[in-house]
Every structure is written in structure tokens, then in C-alpha cells.
């Protein structure tokens, strides 16, 4: 009564009247309803949203938008609307003043509407000031207002058309004005305003249009259409990609995760937290709690010493990304509730078809309702998916960023526990797992909610019978739980095998040259395949489990339906299974199918993510290096006169290991030159590492004053140009740069390089010699102009007088660094007299310290050290024209040699150190070059660009790729799978059609006949579905494993068969990417996608068949809709495919850069370049996400459009059912509409899966890409196999031999004609680039000859297999490479030799004592790259390999250049005795080592200049003589 009085004076105006609104052929709302509800609904919406929206705007300021015509128009219209509403109000007041009685509604509604319009105008201005370009809240408000006004408009028009109607002219006119203004406001709200002032997108050359897109464009994903059109017309390139939105960049995402992880670590530890800063400010207080936001963002990761509990990474991820998931939660909840609208409307539609008296408009109303409901579901669902995918992308970005930052600060001990392979997997596979989970995580609560709601509605429909279905589901729970537990076990085992395989592949790729030289490819291939076999075993078990899982998931909804229907019809004869009950229940069962199907997938995804979560937590919880172990002081600190002060310090590599350095005490005054000398493994390199804070300080105090530069023993070179390697992120200062390059003896090298200092250096410096790499490493340190220089034996890898040049011009008292503090680890005793201080190390302690003269006078360990080497020289014999007069022990007979005052005791060592194969000191002095000349132009950019970026294929994935995959599976299994799929879906269709026939059975005496028959056949069809499901699931899973095995085998075999040039130009990141990410896709993703694709395809075909059978009129509409569908799908796939390829290609640099960083992490830390490398990594990740982000939006773009096509099928199926209701049975209507309701989902899944299929099959394409590259010559040729005892003599002939590195480059060796008799010892000398190493590459056929031939014992080596050749000759390479595994495996990977033979070789290589002392002896595990052995010990292992093989021909490629004098002596003496009857070819740096050789080859510019015995060549006074003279040998 209250509302009646509120709406009319006499209470005659009812609020609601069924006969007016519903039970009529011409429905309308009552006046009261129009004046209250239809006015109040839009007002209520805006007032409810206002406080939340205002709060949101207060916290999200995007900048200020200037007043535009659009904004002025919206504001003006807002005021006009307010005026119109209040005009209505004032008109009411005027009427009352005229004595007319008015109901309160005429005062309240205009007042409320007027105030709401003012609020709307206020919000329009607030949005403008906060930078909102298009508002969803306001657009929705205007839409609701218009829809409500539309109902009123229809009513007013209908009233006006009546003859006896009373018309209120003023209110009607104001309403028409109001309606027009609201309509214009709605239209204006569809457009976006201009960008805010000072917006970051203004300066962006290619901003993402999303930020400036209108609300409508955003919810329909229209803003990406431009890229889709472009991608359809021509393949997308990386330049076409838009910049990432600021909130998605690493710069925004990573620091938040790192900060939250830091807080979580702090909570889980007892001690206060310590922050590791990447700041370069040495005065920054460590562990300070008062840090601003920016500083916190720069904190790399947290060091937390004492454990209480493990920090929870899950909590951290939740805290960081929780708000995004809350948004997705809201969208998902709305969507889930809307899902159940379909079955309820279907129930009403079936009732309508059954009720022939119902007004016609109700059928059209239900159809419209079904369509609108489906469209709203579509928009809500894809906003949800978009949020999930973007959140997943951000999680991946954050995880990669956190792992990278952690890798920069992790201790060396922790680094050893996490191999490169494992860390790369954390970035590739584990980060991806989190990304995948983000999409499904809401299903944890959503799936049970959907199940509960479906069961509730089923209870209303079928009563207690539904409990039978619940019982079936409950029975399935323990089965699913067991499978989930098993899945986790298999997942852990799979990840472990994968880590081991990637680790081994990494090592193989890093040491590929050594593998080829030793012909060890097959041994390592077997090792990889053994690990792969374990991996495939686990995959096979997972496949069986997946088949059982698929069987239960597909069968569960059917079993639930069958058991429910069976109980329903059998418990009571009067229970009739009519169309409404059956098909509404079926629609609900179909809703039930999705959560039941997806839950196991979600569980599996959660299991995988939990494994990854644990791995990631363990890695991020590893201990960090303690930067406080070294006290850093600014260079201007007047209080400290010493640059380095160490007091009673003890250091260890790992907390639990015994100390490596004990009781170290010394100080170095500013500007001093200090040498660190000692035997192999005495702790020289460790001392430098300790000063770099790379070791754990157990006790003591260490102070370093000023900035530090570090040159490691093994040079670390980046895959960038030579110039960029030297500049290392610093500005180019041309004069100083030129001075550095000249001082480091790099000018002659720049002459040789195709593009001077702009030449790109391959990964790990593959296109530079060892000496060149070391000089570039030194130049980098010199150019950075630091205060303290830690130089770890930088002169060992260079020619001796290049060493002299570098010492004089860089390190020595007159060099570029003369005013700097220098700590030089060296084996070159000729430089020792010029040192200010010499530190003698022994057994991890400082045994002596003092100046050269002081140490000699003491006649202690240092004097003994010098005497040992002087006598060693004497024993080896003197060259004819050598220096005479060696004084007695300790006798200081002085002489001048090369401008250095040295004792005679050291004189012979000096001869040895300064002897060389080239004359750099002269060469360098002749170069006076500007940096413009250093940038010598190469023939073409391609000629000098060595490393190929990962390329993206373009265009459609070729059918041949699918065919290749089918062949890899096996054609029988492929066709069997398709046949089983077909059988399964035929059974499914027939069972549903059978159900419709059942529901149409006539009712006789309150019951249906043939119920038992109907039920039995229905059950039998269900069982046949189950059997075929299990069959196809098994077939696809097992076929997938066959394909994985075959594709991996082909890839591995081909990569190992590729020539060395392939590895030089292919970054290892590309190959690691193939063996990790792409192979993981083939292992896990493709079989799953095939099952889903085939299922979706048959579902769509089946649904169309049913709709056509039920309503033949649909034949008119299905073909055009199919055409639209096909067009949209092709449109999408063209762009999606290319985006996936671009994403794949941009992923490789992320891993390559990460690999590079891990190898050079100590250098990066020493130079304090962490920030720059973090920025580079972030940039590469962002580049990768730039391709990924459009691909996820494209997915949504497609889904929205396809679902609209699906919704049209729902609309027409319902419409035709309404039109044909008099000729259709309720059963067929139910069947048709229930299938049409599913079509949307099926279409969506079909396109999603077809695009997933195409984007994932790209992995096969990329694997095949490297399976079909060029191959080197066959390893074995049966017809041309040499005799088993070949070569017997060891005679080597070069006949007019020529060699070039690539077809488009000049010859590096020309017209080589030389014969080396068996048993001869031949030295090969020449300056850098003369072709010395090229000669050995030719001998081993690492590079094939361009002309001429090499004959060994009358056999042309080009005619025999590569392994036949390489097994018969042995090399001791310049870089000693070891692989992780046992020491025995490193010596004899094929297990050809007995333990006795191995021990003999170790004894002869002077390693027996060392190996015998190891706990595991021959089974001692070598670390990755042999890092747990010193360089000298590694070189001796290489010697032991040679002794074990004992071939007739031995090649030494500068094998003793990188070792100390003692190791050099050991190697030389062993070679002289053990290889006495062998042909020995030695590429020599130190001329004295070859002075007793039979003959010497002198190479220059790729040609033999001189050839003869050393004495003959000295008498000729040619090139060799000048070298010997430079070296002080004559």
C-alpha cells in the first residue's frame, strides 16, 4: 500500500500487475514501476559505485588531461541533464502551487535524478583531472540509464497512440529531451579522450594503444585489431611490436617482488636483515634500515644468516600479485553465477514450447535473454582471462628478474650446488609453470562452487536422485587424489632428469671443440641419451597416468548423468524423464563437466608449480656473498695510506670446507706493484678472489681503498663487439681508448679483424685466440681506470715479448697503470726485479714477503724457487748462441737484459719468458692510428657479423611440419588415434540423440514404456565412450613419447654432427633453448593440445549436426556463420603464429645473456657493474614480453569474436525453435538448444586449441630447423677405413694445402707444401694471425681444406672418416676443458682402458700423488668445467689423456702457455721421454721449448716463410733469427 500511495494520490496506480506486464500479448510496465524502479536503478548504481571509484581515482593518478571538445561536450550535457531533471521538479512545485494534488514520486524521482546527474558531471571532471581517458563506470551508467529510459519511451509512445489517452505534454517533452541527452552521452562515452599531459607514452615511438583505447574497445579488445590486420597482410616483425605498458615492465614488477621477499626473509630469521646493494657508492651504509623506495628497489636480494624457518615464497607471490588475483576473483565469481542462467532459460524455453497458449513474444524474450546472457558471459569471462594472463606474465617477469639478481650475489659454494642448467631451468621452465598456473588458480574455488551450484539446481530438477551422481563424484575423489600425488612424484623426477640433461648439454656446447678434437661425440651422446631415457621412462609413466585421468574425467559427468537418471526412473514408476528434466539436467551436467575436467588439470598445474616453487625458494634462499667481509674505503680517505690492508685473515670457499687461505697478513701502499708467486694450487688466485669478497671470510680484517678492476686467469669475453668489450659500459674517450688499445698490443689484431674494433666477438670469444682474449680482458680493466688492479696471470696466454710490451706499457713502473696499486699473480720471474714487493705463497699461506733483493738475500723459499728453474733450464740444454755465464746459487752477478736489471740466476728464465713467435714490440710501435682507423670497414656487415641471432620463420606453419610430427609418432598410432576419437564422438552424439527419443516417449497411465531398454542402451553407449576415450588418450600419449624420443635424437645427433663453424655462429642460448623450452613443449604440451584440439573439433562438428537435425532451418545460418568463423580464425592465426615465433626468438637472448653473466659474474661484481647487467637482463625480458603480450591479447580478441559467432548460433537455434514450436517436439528443442549452448565453449576451445596447436608445433619446426643444418663429413666411412695400426710411421705431408674459414672469406693458409717424417719433432711459430692454429684445425679436419691435401702415412685424410682420423692423432689443447663427471670419465669416456693403464698415465702426467690423495681416487667428481681443479691440474689431466691414447702423432697447441713454469717443465719433460718415437707438432709461444726440435716451420700471413732446423734457420738470419734475437736467444 505504501508504494501505491507514493506513486498516486488515490492509490490507484499499482506498483506491479501481472496481467499488464506478463500475461498479455502486449506487455508494459505500470506507471508506478516506471517512475520508481526505472528511475532509481541507474541512480542507485552510480551512488553505490561512487565511493569505491573515488577512492580508486585518488590512488591512481595518470596525469592531467586538458579540456577537449569531447570533455566540454560531456560536461555541458551533464549540466543540461541536471537542468532537465530540475525543470521536471520545478514543474511539479508549480503544479502544487496551482492547487493540484501530486504524488510524492513526482518530487522525489526528479530530485534524485537531478543530484545523480550533478554527481555524473562531477565524476567527468574528476576523471579528467586524474587522467582517465575512457571510463567504464560512466559508460555503464549511461547504458543503464538509456535502457531504463527506453522502456519508459516505449510505454509513452504506446500511450500516445491510444485514442483516449491523457497526455502530460510538459513531462513528455522533458522526458524526450532527457532521453536524447542520455543517448548522446552514451555515444560520447564510447570515445576516448586525449592522452594526459606529461604522459610517458608521448615520447614513446611505438606506444601500446591499450592505454588510450576507449572502454568499449578495451572490453572487446578492439584496440589490437590494427596489429591483427597488419599481421594478416604481411608477417609481423619485431619493429611492429608495441612498447610494454609501464606497469608490466621489469622495472615496475621485479623490485616489488624482491622487496617483499626481503621482508619475508627478515621475518623468518633471527638476525636483522642485511641488504645487498648494487649501488656503486662505496660509502652506502650496508644494512641500513632507513632506505627510500628507490633504494629498496635497487636492493638485489636479502642475506639472512640464521635460520628459524624457511621463508615462504608463496606468501611473497601472493602479497605481490594478490590484488590482480582479487580482480580476477570478482570477474570469475560473476561469470560462474551467470553460467547457470543458460540452463534456467532453457527450462523456460522448453516450457514455452510445451505451452501452446503462451504469448509468442515470451519465446522471443527468452531467446533475447539467452543471447544477452551469453554475450555478457563472453565479455566477463575474457576480462577475467586477460587479467589472469597479464598476472601470469608479470609473475614470470618478476621470477626471472629475481633469479637473475640472485645469481649476481650468490656465494660460490651455493653456485656449485645450483648448476647453470638448473638456474636456466628456473628461468625457462619453472617461471613458465607459474605463468600457466595463473590462468587456472581461481579454479581451486571456482570449480567446487560450480559443482555445488549445479548439484543444487539438479536437486531442484530431479530431487534426491542426484545423490547417486554425488556418490559417483565422491568415489572419484580418492582416485584423483592418488593420481595427483603420483603426478607430483613423476614431476619431481622429470625435472631432476631435465636439469641433469640441460647441465650436460650446456657443458657439451661449451666444450664442443674439445669433443670434436678427441672424437668423443658418441660417448657424450650416449651419456645424454641415458639421462633422456630416464626422463622418457618418467614421461611414459605420466602418460599412463594421464590416460587413466582422461578416462575418469571424461566418464565422470556421463556416469553422474547415467546414475542420476537410472535412480530417478527406477525408484518410482511415476517419475517421468521428460524433455525439460532431461535437457536442463544435461545442460547442468555439461556445466559440471568443465570443473570436473579442469580440476585434475589445475591439480596437475598446482603440483608442477609447487615443485617449481620449492626449487625457486631453495635457490633464492641460498646464501649470498657478504659484501661486509671487505671494508671498502673511498680513494680520497686521508686516514689510510695503504691501498690494501689484510690482517690475520682466513678464507674458505664454502662455510663447511676447510680454509683455503690461513692467517694472511700484508699491506700494499698506494701505487705499489706487487707480485704474487708460488707453486700450482698454493692459493694465488684464491688470494685475489678473497680481496674481491668472492670467498667466505672466517676471521680477520680486510680493507680495500678505492675502486677495483680485475683480470681473471681465464679471460671472460662477451658476445658483443671488441670495442664494447673494452669500454664495458663506459663512455668512449677517444685518446685514452687508443692509448689503451696500443698499450695492450691489440693494434696488429685490429688489422687482422674484418671490421677492426667493431668486429663482433662470438660467444666466449670463439673467434679470438687465447692471447687475444687475455689482452681484451686486460684492456677492459685498464680502460675502466680503477684505483686497484688485481691481475691473475694476464701475461701467461700471450707471446713472451708481447708480454714484455704489455708489462712495459701497462703494468710496469712506466706503464699506463704506474700510479695505480697493482697485484700481479705471475709465473714470469723475469719481471720480478721490477716489483716493489713480492708475496710468496705456499700451501694457502704467505711464506715470504719483501722486495726482490730482500728475498734473494734471505736465501729462503723464493731463492730456492729461482735456483730450481735456473737449473731446470741448464738441464734442458742451451741453444748454441744462448747467453753464457750462470752464476752460482745465490750469487748476484748482474747483467742488463732488455732494459731490466736482473740477477744472472734469473737470466735464463728471462730468456725463456721473453722468447716468442712474433715481434709485437716492433709492430706496435709502428702503429699511430686514430680510432676512426681502428674501425676498419669490412667487406659487408654480414662478413664480420659472426653470431647469428635466433631467426623467426614467417608465414603459415608448413603442412610438412605436421607430417614430420606424425611420422615421428608413427603413422599407425596417428591414424588409430583419429579413428578412436571419431568412435568416441559418434557414441556421444548417438547417446544424446537416444536421450531425446527417450524423453519424447509417450506417457501411458502416468508412466513411460521401454524405460529399461532406453536406460540399458544409454548406459552401453556411455561405456563405449569410456573405452574409446581410454584408447585415444593412451594412443596420443604414447605417440607423443615416440615423437619426443625421435625428435630429440635427431636434434642431438645433428647438433653433434654439425661443423665447428655452426657453433661459432650459433649462440649457445639458442641451442639450450631448443633442448630445454622447445623440447619441453614437445614432451608435455603438444600431446595434451592434440587431445584437446581433436576433442573440440569433433564436438563442434557434432553440435552442428544435432542443430541441423533438430531445426533444418539452421542450414541457412550455419554456413555464413561458419564462413565468419573461418575468416576470423585465419585472420588471427596469421598474427598469432608470428607473435609466437617472435616470442620464441626473443627468448633465446634472455638465456644467452644469463649464461654469459654466470660465466663472468666475478668480473661483473669486481667492476661493480651489477646494475648495468640487471638493466640489460630486464630489457631483454621486456623485449620478450613485448611479443608475448600482444599474443595473449590476440587470443582474447579472437575468443570474444568467436564466442559472438557461437552466441549467434544460440540465438538462431532458439529463434528457429520458437518459430517452429508447433512442429517440433520438446525433446528435439531441448537437444538442439542444449547443444547450441555448448557450441560457444566448443568454438572457443577449437580455435584456442588450433592456435595452440600451431603455436606449439612451432617447437617441432624449431627443433627440425637445427636437425637439418649442414653436417661435417661422415665420422666413419666403411669402405675407406684405414688399417687398425695406422699410422705406423707418423709421416705427415702437406701438398699445396690451403684453408679458409668461410667461403666468403680469404684463404688463411696458402700453398703449404711440407713433409714431416715419422718421429720428427717440429715447432710451428709465427705472429698472431699467421695461421699456426689453422694448421692444426686443418690437420684434425675441424676446418676442411679449400685446396690441396694432407697425407698421413700414404693415406689422404680427406678420404677417411673424421673419427678414424681424430682417434689416431692426439692434441693437448690450449684451453684445458674438463666435463662434470668422474676423473676417469674425463680421461677415458669410452672405458677402453684398464684402471692400471689409467693410473700409469696419471703417474707419467705427475698427477698420481694428487689423485691418490683424493677420497674417491679415479671416481673423484669433477665440477662443471673442472672448476674444482686448478688450471695447471686441468692441463696435466689433458696430458694424461694424450698419454693414455699414445698415438703416433701428437699436437701441442700452445699447451703450456697458460700454466706456470713448474707445470710447463713437467709437461715438456714427459713429452720428451714418453713421445720419443712419435711425431710431435708444437705451436710454440716460448721459442726455447722448440730449440732442440728437429725442424721448425715459420709461418707468416698464412704461408711458410722458413722451414728447417733451428740452427739452420738461425744461420739464415731471416724471420726466425729476428724472433730469436727479440727473445734474447741469440
From Swiss-Prot:
Does the UniProt entry include the keyword Isomerase?
no
Query: Entry's Pfam families?
Result: ABC_membrane (PF00664), ABC_tran (PF00005), TMD0_ABC (PF24357)
What keywords sit in the KW lines? ATP-binding, Cell membrane, Glycoprotein, Hydrolase, Lipid transport, Membrane, Nucleotide-binding, Phosphoprotein, Repeat, Translocase, Transmembrane, Transmembrane helix, Transport
Q: Which residue positions does N6-succinyllysine occur at?
A: 503
**Binding of ATP 1, residues:** 678-685
| Gene3D superfamilies (alphabetical) | ABC transporter type 1, transmembrane domain (1.20.1560.10), P-loop containing nucleotide triphosphate hydrolases (3.40.50.300)
Which residue numbers delimit the ABC transporter domain?
644-868, 1292-1526
Question: Where, in residue ranges, is this chain on the Extracellular side?
Answer: 1-33, 96-100, 155-172, 338-363, 462-464, 569-590, 988-1024, 1110, 1224-1225
Q: What is its main location?
A: membrane
Q: Which residues are modified to Phosphotyrosine?
A: 277
- Transmembrane intervals: 34-54, 75-95, 101-121, 134-154, 173-193, 317-337, 364-384, 441-461, 465-485, 548-568, 591-611, 967-987, 1025-1045, 1089-1109, 1111-1131, 1203-1223, 1226-1246
Q: Which CDD domains match?
A: ABC_6TM_MRP1_2_3_6_D1_like, ABC_6TM_MRP1_2_3_6_D2_like, ABCC_MRP_domain1, ABCC_MRP_domain2
Family indicated by similarity:
Belongs to the ABC transporter superfamily. ABCC family. Conjugate transporter (TC 3.A.1.208) subfamily.
Tell me the protein's name: Multidrug resistance-associated protein 1
Amino acid at each position: 500500500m505504501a508504494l501505491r500511495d507514493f506513486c498516486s494520490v488515490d492509490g490507484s496506480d499499482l506498483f506491479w500487475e501481472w496481467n499488464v506486464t506478463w500475461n498479455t500479448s502486449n506487455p508494459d510496465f505500470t506507471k508506478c514501476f516506471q517512475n520508481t524502479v526505472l528511475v532509481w536503478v541507474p541512480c542507485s548504481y552510480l551512488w553505490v559505485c561512487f565511493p569505491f571509484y573515488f577512492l580508486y581515482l585518488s590512488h591512481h593518478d595518470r596525469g592531467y588531461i586538458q579540456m577537449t571538445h569531447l570533455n566540454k561536450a560531456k560536461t555541458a550535457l551533464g549540466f543540461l541533464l541536471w537542468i532537465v531533471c530540475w525543470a521536471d521538479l520545478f514543474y511539479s512545485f508549480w503544479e502544487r502551487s496551482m492547487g493540484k494534488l501530486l504524488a510524492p514520486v513526482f518530487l522525489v524521482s526528479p530530485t534524485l535524478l537531478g543530484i545523480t546527474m550533478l554527481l555524473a558531471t562531477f565524476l567527468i571532471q574528476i576523471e579528467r583531472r586524474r587522467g582517465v581517458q575512457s571510463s567504464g563506470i560512466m559508460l555503464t551508467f549511461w547504458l543503464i540509464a538509456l535502457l531504463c529510459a527506453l522502456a519508459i519511451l516505449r510505454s509513452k509512445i504506446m500511450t500516445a497512440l491510444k485514442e483516449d489517452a491523457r497526455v502530460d505534454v510538459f513531462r513528455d517533452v522533458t522526458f524526450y529531451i532527457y532521453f536524447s541527452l542520455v543517448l548522446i552521452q552514451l555515444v560520447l562515452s564510447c570515445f576516448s579522450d586525449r592522452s594526459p599531459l606529461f604522459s610517458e607514452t608521448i615520447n614513446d615511438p611505438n606506444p601500446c594503444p591499450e592505454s588510450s583505447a576507449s572502454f568499449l574497445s578495451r572490453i572487446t579488445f578492439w584496440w589490437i585489431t590494427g596489429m591483427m590486420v597488419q599481421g594478416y597482410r604481411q608477417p609481423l616483425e619485431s619493429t611492429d611490436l608495441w612498447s610494454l605498458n609501464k606497469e608490466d615492465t621489469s622495472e615496475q614488477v621485479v623490485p616489488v617482488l624482491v622487496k617483499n621477499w626481503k621482508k619475508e626473509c627478515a621475518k623468518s630469521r633471527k638476525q636483522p636483515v642485511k641488504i645487498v646493494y648494487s649501488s656503486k657508492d662505496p660509502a652506502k651504509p650496508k644494512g641500513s634500515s632507513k632506505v627510500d623506495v628507490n633504494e629498496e628497489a635497487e636492493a638485489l636480494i636479502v642475506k639472512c644468516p640464521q635460520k628459524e624457518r624457511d621463508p615462504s615464497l608463496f606468501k611473497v607471490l601472493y602479497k605481490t600479485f594478490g590484488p590482480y588475483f582479487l580482480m580476477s576473483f570478482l570477474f570469475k565469481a560473476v561469470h560462474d553465477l551467470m553460467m547457470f542462467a543458460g540452463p534456467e532459460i532453457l527450462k523456460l524455453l522448453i516450457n514455452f514450447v510445451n505451452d501452446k497458449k503462451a504469448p509468442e513474444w515470451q519465446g522471443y524474450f527468452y531467446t533475447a535473454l539467452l543471447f544477452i546472457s551469453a554475450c555478457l558471459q563472453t565479455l566477463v569471462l575474457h576480462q577475467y582471462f586477460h587479467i589472469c594472463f597479464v598476472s601470469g606474465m608479470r609473475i614470470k617477469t618478476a621470477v626471472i628478474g629475481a633469479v637473475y639478481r640472485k645469481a649476481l650475489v650468490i656465494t660460490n659454494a651455493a653456485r656449485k650446488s645450483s648448476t647453470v642448467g638448473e638456474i636456466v631451468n628456473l628461468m625457462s621452465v619453472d617461471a613458465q609453470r607459474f605463468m600457466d598456473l595463473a590462468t587456472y588458480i581461481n579454479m581451486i574455488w571456482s570449480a567446487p562452487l560450480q559443482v555445488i551450484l549445479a548439484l543444487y539446481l539438479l536437486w531442484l530438477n530431479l530431487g534426491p536422485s542426484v545423490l547417486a551422481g554425488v556418490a559417483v563424484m565422491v568415489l572419484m575423489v580418492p582416485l584423483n587424489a592418488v593420481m595427483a600425488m603420483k603426478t607430483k612424484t613423476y614431476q619431481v623426477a622429470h625435472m631432476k632428469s631435465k636439469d641433469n640433461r640441460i647441465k650436460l648439454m650446456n657443458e657439451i656446447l661449451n666444450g664442443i671443440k674439445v669433443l670434436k678434437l678427441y672424437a668423443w661425440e658418441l660417448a657424450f651422446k650416449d651419456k645424454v641419451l641415458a639421462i633422456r631415457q630416464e626422463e622418457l621412462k618418467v614421461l611414459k609413466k605420466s602418460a599412463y597416468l594421464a590416460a587413466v585421468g582422461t578416462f575418469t574425467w571424461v566418464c565422470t559427468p556421463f556416469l553422474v548423468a547415467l546414475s542420476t537418471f537410472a535412480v530417478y526412473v527406477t525408484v518410482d514408476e511415476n517419475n517421468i524423464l521428460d524433455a525439460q528434466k532431461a535437457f536442463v539436467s544435461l545442460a547442468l551436467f555439461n556445466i559440471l563437466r568443465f570443473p570436473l575436467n579442469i580440476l585434475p588439470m589445475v591439480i596437475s598445474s598446482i603440483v608442477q608449480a609447487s615443485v617449481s616453487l620449492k626449487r625457486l625458494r631453495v635457490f633464492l634462499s641460498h646464501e649470498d656473498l657478504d659484501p661486509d667481509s671487505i671494508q671498502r674505503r673511498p680513494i680520497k680517505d686521508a686516514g689510510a695510506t695503504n691501498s690494501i690492508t689484510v690482517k690475520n685473515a682466513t678464507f674458505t670457499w664454502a662455510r663447511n670446507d676447510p680454509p683455503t687461505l690461513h692467517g694472511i697478513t700484508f699491506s700494499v701502499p698506494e701505487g705499489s706493484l706487487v707480485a704474487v708467486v708460488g707453486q700450482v694450487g698454493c692459493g694465488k688466485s684464491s688470494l685475489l678472489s678473497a680481496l674481491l669478497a668472492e670467498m667466505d671470510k672466517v676471521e680477520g680484517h680486510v680493507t680495500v681503498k678505492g675502486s677495483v678492476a680485475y683480470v681473471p686467469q681465464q679471460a671472460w669475453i662477451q658476445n658483443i663487439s671488441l670495442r664494447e668489450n673494452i669500454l664495458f659500459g663506459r663512455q668512449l674517450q677517444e685518446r685514452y681508448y687508443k692509448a689503451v688499445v696500443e698499450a695492450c698490443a691489440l693494434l696488429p689484431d685490429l688489422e687482422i679483424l674484418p671490421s677492426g674494433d667493431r668486429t663482433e666477438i662470438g660467444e666466449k670469444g670463439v673467434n679470438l685466440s687465447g692471447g687475444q682474449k687475455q689482452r681484451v680482458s686486460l684492456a677492459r680493466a685498464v680502460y675502466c681506470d680503477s684505483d686497484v688492479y688485481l691481475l691473475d696471470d694476464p701475461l701467461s696466454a700471450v707471446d713472451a715479448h708481447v708480454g714484455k710490451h704489455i708489462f712495459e706499457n701497462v703494468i710496469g713502473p712506466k706503464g699506463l697503470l704506474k700510479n695505480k696499486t697493482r697485484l700481479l699473480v705471475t709465473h714470469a720471474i723475469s719481471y720480478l726485479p721490477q716489483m716493489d714487493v713480492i708475496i710468496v705463497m705456499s700451501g694457502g699461506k704467505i711464506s715470504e714477503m719483501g722486495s726482490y733483493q730482500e728475498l734473494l738475500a734471505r736465501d729462503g723459499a723464493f731463492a730456492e724457487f729461482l735456483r730450481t728453474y735456473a737449473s731446470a733450464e741448464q738441464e734442458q740444454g742451451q741453444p748454441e748462441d744462448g747467453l753464457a755465464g750462470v752464476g752460482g746459487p745465490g750469487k748476484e752477478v748482474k747483467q742488463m737484459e732488455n732494459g731490466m736489471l736482473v740477477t744472472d740466476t734469473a737470466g735464463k728464465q728471462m730468456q725463456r719468458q721473453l722468447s716468442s713467435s712474433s715481434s709485437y714490440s716492433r709492430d706496435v710501435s709502428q702503429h699511430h692510428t686514430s680510432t676512426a682507423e681502428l674501425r676498419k670497414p669490412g667487406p659487408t656487415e654480414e662478413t664480420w657479423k659472426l653470431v647469428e641471432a635466433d631467426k623467426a620463420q614467417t608465414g603459415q606453419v608448413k603442412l610438412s611440419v605436421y607430417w614430420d610430427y606424425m611420422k615421428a609418432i608413427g603413422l599407425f598410432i596417428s591414424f588409430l588415434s583419429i579413428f578412436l576419437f571419431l568412435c568416441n564422438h559418434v557414441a556421444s552424439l548417438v547417446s544424446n540423440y537416444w536421450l531425446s527419443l527417450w524423453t519424447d516417449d509417450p506417457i501411458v497411465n502416468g508412466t513411460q514404456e521401454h524405460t529399461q531398454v532406453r536406460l540399458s542402451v544409454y548406459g552401453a553407449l556411455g561405456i563405449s565412450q569410456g573405452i574409446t576415450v581410454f584408447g585415444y588418450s593412451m594412443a596420443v600419449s604414447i605417440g607423443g613419447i615416440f615423437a619426443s624420443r625421435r625428435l630429440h635424437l635427431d636434434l642431438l645427433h645433428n647438433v653433434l654432427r654439425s661443423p665447428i663453424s655452426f657453433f661459432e655462429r650459433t649462440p649457445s642460448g639458442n641451442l639450450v633453448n631448443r633442448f630445454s623450452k622447445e623440447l619441453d613443449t614437445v614432451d608435455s604440451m603438444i600431446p595434451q593440445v592434440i587431445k584437446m584440439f581433436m576433442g573440440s573439433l569433433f564436438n563442434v562438428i557434432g553440435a552442428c549436426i544435432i542443430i541441423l537435425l533438430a531445426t533444418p532451418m539452421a542450414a541457412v545460418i550455419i554456413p555464413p556463420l561458419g564462413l565468419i568463423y573461418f575468416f576470423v580464425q585465419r585472420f588471427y592465426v596469421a598474427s598469432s603464429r608470428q607473435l609466437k615465433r617472435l616470442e620464441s626468438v626473443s627468448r633465446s637472448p634472455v638465456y644467452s645473456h644469463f649464461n654469459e653473466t654466470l660465466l663472468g659474474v666475478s668480473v661483473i661484481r669486481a667492476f661493480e657493474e651489477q646494475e648495468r647487467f640487471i638493466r640489460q637482463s630486464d630489457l631483454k625480458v621486456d623485449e620478450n614480453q613485448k611479443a608475448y603480450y600482444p599474443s595473449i591479447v590476440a587470443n582474447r580478441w579472437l575468443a570474444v569474436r568467436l564466442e559472438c559467432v557461437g552466441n549467434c548460433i544460440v540465438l538462431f537455434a532458439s529463434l528457429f525453435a520458437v518459430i517452429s514450436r508447433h512442429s517440433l517436439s520438446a525433446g528435439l528443442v531441448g537437444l538442439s538448444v542444449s547443444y547450441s549452448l555448448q557450441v560457444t565453449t566448443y568454438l572457443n576451445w577449437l580455435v584456442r586449441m588450433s592456435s595452440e596447436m600451431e603455436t606449439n608445433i612451432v617447437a617441432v619446426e624449431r627443433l627440425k630447423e637445427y636437425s637439418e643444418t649442414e653436417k661435417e663429413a661422415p665420422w666413419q666411412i666403411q669402405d675407406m677405413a684405414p688399417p687398425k695400426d695406422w699410422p705406423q710411421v707418423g709421416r705427415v705431408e702437406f701438398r699445396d694445402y690451403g684453408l679458409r674459414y668461410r667461403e666468403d672469406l680469404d684463404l688463411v693458409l696458402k700453398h703449404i707444401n711440407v713433409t714431416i717424417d715419422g718421429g720428427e719433432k717440429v715447432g710451428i711459430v709465427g705472429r698472431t694471425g699467421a695461421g699456426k692454429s689453422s694448421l692444426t684445425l686443418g690437420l684434425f679436419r675441424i676446418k676442411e681444406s679449400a685446396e690441396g691435401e694432407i697425407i698421413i702415412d700414404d693415406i689422404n685424410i680427406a678420404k677417411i672418416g673424421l673419427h678414424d682420423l681424430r682417434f689416431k692423432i692426439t692434441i693437448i689443447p690450449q684451453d684445458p676443458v674438463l666435463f662434470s663427471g668422474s676423473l676417469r670419465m674425463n680421461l677415458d669416456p669410452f672405458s677402453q682402458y684398464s684402471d692400471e693403464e689409467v693410473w700409469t698415465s696419471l703417474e707419467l702426467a705427475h698427477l698420481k700423488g694428487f689423485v691418490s690423495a683424493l677420497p674417491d681416487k679415479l671416481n673423484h667428481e669433477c665440477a662443471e668445467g673442472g672448476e674444482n681443479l686448478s688450471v695447471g691440474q686441468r692441463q696435466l689431466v689433458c696430458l694424461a689423456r694424450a698419454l693414455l691414447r699414445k698415438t703416433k702423432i701428437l699436437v701441442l697447441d700452445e699447451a703450456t702457455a697458460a700454466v706456470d713454469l713448474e707445470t710447463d717443465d713437467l709437461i715438456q719433460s714427459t713429452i720428451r721421454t714418453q713421445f720419443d718415437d712419435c711425431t710431435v707438432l708444437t705451436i710454440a709461444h716460448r721459442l726455447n721449448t722448440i730449440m732442440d726440435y728437429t725442424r721448425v716451420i715459420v709461418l707468416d700471413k698464412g704461408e711458410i716463410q722458413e722451414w728447417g732446423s733451428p740452427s739452420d734457420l738461425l744461420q739464415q738470419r731471416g724471420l726466425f733469427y729476428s724472433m730469436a734475437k727479440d727473445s734474447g736467444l741469440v
